Regions:
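Bacterial Sec-dependent N-terminal signal peptides
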Residues: 1-29
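Phosphate/dinucleotide-binding and metal-coordinating scaffold of catalytic cores
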Residues: 28-319
Length: 319
């Protein structure tokens, strides 16, 4: 009887060990497979639902730019599935930082370990929320998002964006949850790696340091959307990168960002300065380099060739 009991117990032990081994192996495989997946943060267009938990009073009133606030970011993958990680949050920008209730945000997700290849390569992620609470500010942030998508039509060397619906939760429980639109902006390092380029930080650059056709394309695009709020010198609302695979001339590629002062957005606060010489941002003025009509005609023909795609992007956005 003891022998039978011993054999039976031994068999149970072996089965238990096999189950444990298989369970451990399966868990390790799952983690490994997850780490190889891309979240497709800037490849897909579907709106992302996120929850951002932080001390809203400190964010609204102090708008810290030097030190990160403790925050928690939850990405809702579906109605039942989500990823939640502790992160750091601080504000950025100049005009909107000083004048908006919701200042532009930088999320520090370097140590978040989401388990997705693209997310885990990002250290700092820019987020553009709507400026204030009312409906018109919701329209502004959506139109600014659209401006990025329109420039994507012209070139791959452009900042990709991802639309968000954000649920702001006050960790101090002094405010009710706030739900608004916002969008993520592709980090410059990610854009540079994607296009095989190198970021150029020199503030002394001017338009003559940019590849001519790239400079003309940007000037015409800004004319099209009524954008005066940019400058290559000082890299005001533009970033400059240099290709590592072509253009041996050493000239750079200029990429625009921050479109809230454009005629396309038409924000009430976007008032041209006296130096611009226009009454409003919907009155166009061209700020390109002086070139021949033939040169600009080539670039204008390219814009006309993209007309159908421009309309497709706009119509898809409106539906």
């Amino acid at each position: 009887m003891k022998k039978i009991f011993f054999q039976f117990s031994f068999v149970i032990l072996i089965i238990f060990l096999l189950i444990c081994i298989n369970t451990v192996s399966f868990a390790q495989t799952t983690v490994a497979d997850s780490s190889k997946k891309s979240f497709r943060l800037f490849e897909d267009d579907k709106i992302i639902e996120i929850t951002l938990s932080l001390d809203l009073t400190t964010y609204f009133k102090l708008k810290p730019k030097d030190e990160y606030l403790k925050a928690n970011l939850t990405i809702h993958l579906s109605k039942k599935d989500s990823i939640s990680r502790d992160i750091g949050l601080k504000t950025r920008g100049i005009w909107r930082n000083q004048n908006c209730t919701f200042a532009p945000i930088e999320l520090n997700i370097k140590k978040a370990a989401f388990g997705y290849t693209d997310l885990d390569k990002i250290s700092k992620l820019k987020m553009t929320p709507q400026c204030n609470f009312n409906k018109i500010n919701e329209d502004y942030v959506l139109r600014e998002f659209l401006a990025y998508k329109l420039f994507n039509v012209l070139t791959d060397t452009s900042f990709r964006v991802r639309l968000l619906r954000v649920n702001y939760i006050d960790t101090q429980k002094k405010r009710k949850p706030i739900i608004q639109y916002a969008f993520f902006i592709e980090p410059l390092e990610m854009l540079s790696a994607r296009t095989n380029c190198l970021p150029i930080k020199l503030r002394t650059l001017n338009q003559k340091n940019i590849i001519p056709r790239i400079m003309d394309r940007l000037s015409l695009f800004n004319f099209m959307i009524g954008n005066y709020d940019w400058s290559v010198p000082g890299q005001h609302n533009v970033s400059v990168i240099k290709s590592l695979s072509y253009e041996p001339t050493g000239l750079g590629i200029v990429i625009p960002h921050d479109f809230d002062w454009t005629g396309l957005v038409n924000a009430t606060y976007a008032i041209p300065t006296e130096e611009i010489g226009t009454e409003n941002v919907r009155e166009r003025k061209f700020f390109g380099v002086c070139r021949s009509k033939e040169v600009y005609k080539q670039e204008l023909d390219m814009f006309l060739g993209k007309k159908a795609e421009f309309y497709r992007v706009i119509n898809d956005f409106l539906t």
